[in-house]
């Protein structure tokens, strides 16, 4: 067989254009395994020897270690509350009531009472126009709407008698349109059961189902007994594997390997 017939198709081995990380061998995830020596991060699958350590120096004890303010409970407190002993306290001195502050002579202004005690001439002042005067718009003579005196519309005026002709009725006249007369189908026919005897009526209800398990159960056709291979012998079966890559890392089954 010639070397040309070894390869199938147009693919031939060639040098890759760039570096492939899988082509370089490395220890892989072996370094991520826990160590088998020492005390910290020891592999639990490995046997571990005895290890001894020295204790640490304790902190100096402080002289004052009180239980805190939670234990400062008054002595008159029992498990049901206070013991009921009367307690007294001294209040502060109340302030004196302030007396009435009588106004003195300087608080009055007698010079302003001249107009009330002595005769004085009349005095007039000009004030601004009030707001109501500006809004008071009196209607003129042309603004009144007097009712007319003709006809019976005025109550206090005498009026002559009025005669009017009524319109001609279209019903029963010679020009009545008989085509607009309603036919028999226009009226609503009353049900005969209203004024006659009505026979009995019966109806059939649906079938009532007894309460029970309503889940769907598989029938005989839902099972495949020919595919059962636990109760009888079965011929061996084989399958073809797949092509594995040479760059796949091996599976670690044991740390000792």
From Swiss-Prot:
Intracellular or extracellular location(s): Cell projection, Cilium, Flagellum
Q: Which GO terms describe its cellular component?
A: cytoskeleton; motile cilium
Main location class: other
What Pfam families is this protein classified in?
A: SHIPPO-rpt
Keywords associated with the record: Cell projection, Cilium, Flagellum, Repeat
- Intervals holding STPGR repeats: 103-129, 182-207, 218-243
The family assignment reads: Belongs to the CIMAP family.
What this protein is called in its record is Ciliary microtubule associated protein 1B
Annotated source species: Danio rerio
